[in-house]
Amino acid sequence: MNNIIKQIEQEQMKQDVPAFRPGDSVEVKVWVVEGSKKRLQAFEGVVIAIRNRGLHSAFTVRKISNGEGVERVFQTHSPVIDSIAVKRRGAVRKAKLYYLRERTGKAARIKERLN
């Protein structure tokens, strides 16, 4: 039974997910349905957390919009996600960057990773 579940989950996992880490700036293109129309919407921000659980993996992206912090949790292998593009690599020492929630402006900046 367990092997059947693993096999089905393996088939549903996306293969084209780029490698990214917390601190990286990413642009996630998401399919949005408005009435009868379907369009792509971009959400660009800093990855503050990653949850690796196979098919149930997720990551949290944070951005500042009109002076207000906005966080969105994306399921990594969701069919709603069209593409994930890494814009900038960040150098951080922690896996969860929740401390960025209290910081604003220049204090919330992340150094760029050179390698």
UniProtKB/Swiss-Prot annotation:
GO terms for cellular component: cytosolic large ribosomal subunit. Keywords: Ribonucleoprotein, Ribosomal protein. One of its GO terms (biological process) is translation. Belongs to the bacterial ribosomal protein bL19 family. This protein is located at the 30S-50S ribosomal subunit interface and may play a role in the structure and function of the aminoacyl-tRNA binding site. SUPFAM superfamilies: Translation proteins SH3-like domain. GO terms for molecular function: structural constituent of ribosome. This is Large ribosomal subunit protein bL19. InterPro entries: Ribosomal_bL19, Ribosomal_bL19_CS, Ribosomal_bL19_sf, Translation_prot_SH3-like_sf. Coiled coil: none annotated.
